Every structure is written in structure tokens, then in C-alpha cells.
Amino acid sequence: MSAGRQLVLEFPHRPALGKTDFLVSDCNMDAVGWIDRWPDWQGPAIAVYGPPDCGKTHLAHVWRNRSGAVLISGPELGDRAAPDILGGADSCAVDDADALSDEEALLHLYNHIAEIGGKLLLAGRHPPARWSLKLADLASRVAAAQAVEIRPPDDELLGALLVKLFYDRQLTVSKDVLVYLLARMERSFAAASAIVDALDQLGLAERRGVTVPLARTVLNELETNSDTNGED
């Protein structure tokens, strides 16, 4: 950090996670369609997968609000009993389901939900067939779930995503900044999140608005950090 930059306190921002806040495009239309189709799924579970920051967690929140399901992350499952996890609900969304802390907990949760006629939404980075599962019974159930991919964003969605991320942080940006970023940034959800976060932090540190020069600085710094991390 340069001497001219101020210390920035980390204040949490609250992303908008409602249905109307979700940005729909060709890359995620299938996933949105399955959420809208609930409860008329082909089986007890579906598995939504895609790259980091692609909206899996957002969709899980949307489905939770619509279905009354419980939302929990894979690492938080622990060895808890299925009725304890559900707490009276009949359905559950498991975010980061491919980063489990206890496979048996998910297996019991799956079986319990299927038995009581509920639904299970699994969200992860990879297709369920590629999850490293040791329990054969769990692997077969996950593999049988309807797999729904969220693909990398197109330019239209990427632009809309930048606008939403800036809005979530109450940052005002001009069209020139958006055009500059879209012409030069990596085409990924994670890159959009990293860029907006860096612009927010640097703008606060230097007490500057989000401008093209600030965007240029952030892109250069992120590229430098990426090159450094990629070195042996």
C-alpha cells in the first residue's frame, strides 16, 4: 500500500439476493428454469454447478425464499442429523455441496428428504459426476440428480453484473468506466467481483470516485498480482 493511501475499515456490504435482482441470460437460463419449475422436479434433487461467483448462492437464496427450504453450506453440515438440519422444513439447499465436511450427513439428508417428499438443491463448482465422493450410495444419488450448468457470462450479462455489483456497494459509475472495464477485463464472474471489490477499496483508501484512471490502476494491479502468483 502506498503512503498516500488511507487505512480502510472493512464494512460489510449487503448484496441484493431477491428473485428480481438475479440477472438472467443465456448462460444461466436453464438453472433459473429449474428453480421456477419447483416443485415439479424429476426427482428429489437437482445439482446446479458453475464457476465461482456465477450466482449459485443467489439462486439458492431465491429458491429458499420460494420453497421455505433451509439453506446451509456443505462444510456446515458436520455430522448433524437430517431432522435437526431441516428444523421442520421438508426441503434444503446445500451451497458448496462439493466441499463436504461429512458425506454421511448429506447421504442421510438426501434419504430423509426423499422419504418425506421434499426437495434438495445442491450447488457446487463442478458437475456432480466429478465430485470426489467416497460413499458409493451418496455418489450414485448425486450422479442421478438433474445436473444444471451455469456457464461463463456473455458480454451483456457481464456488463449488467458490474452494474449490480457497483449498486450493491452503493457506488456510482459512469458508462465510460463500464466500457473501459468490459473492453479489458477477464470474462468471468470472479473477475467482475474482484474488480469491483478492488475499486471500492482503492476508492475509499484514496478518497476518490470510481473513474477510468482508477479502473486502469486496479486492472494493472490485479494483472501484476496474477502474474506474480503464477510464477514458480
Place the predicted regions along the sequence by residue.
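A short, basic N-terminal segment
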Residues: 1-37, 42, 204, 208-232
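Walker A/P-loop nucleotide-binding motif
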Residues: 43-59
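Post-Walker A helix-loop "phosphate-sensing" segment adjacent to the P-loop in P-loop NTPases
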Residues: 64-75
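Conserved P-loop NTPase "ATPase switch" module shared by AAA+ and STAND
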Residues: 84-109, 116-125
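Short regulatory helix/loop adjacent to the ATP-binding pocket of P-loop NTPases
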Residues: 128-143
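Conserved AAA+ ATPase "sensor/coupling" helix adjacent to the nucleotide-binding pocket
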Residues: 136, 145, 159-172
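Conserved AAA+ ATPase "SRH/arginine-finger" region at the nucleotide-binding site
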Residues: 145-157
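C-terminal helical "lid" of AAA+/P-loop NTPase domains
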Residues: 179-183, 190-204
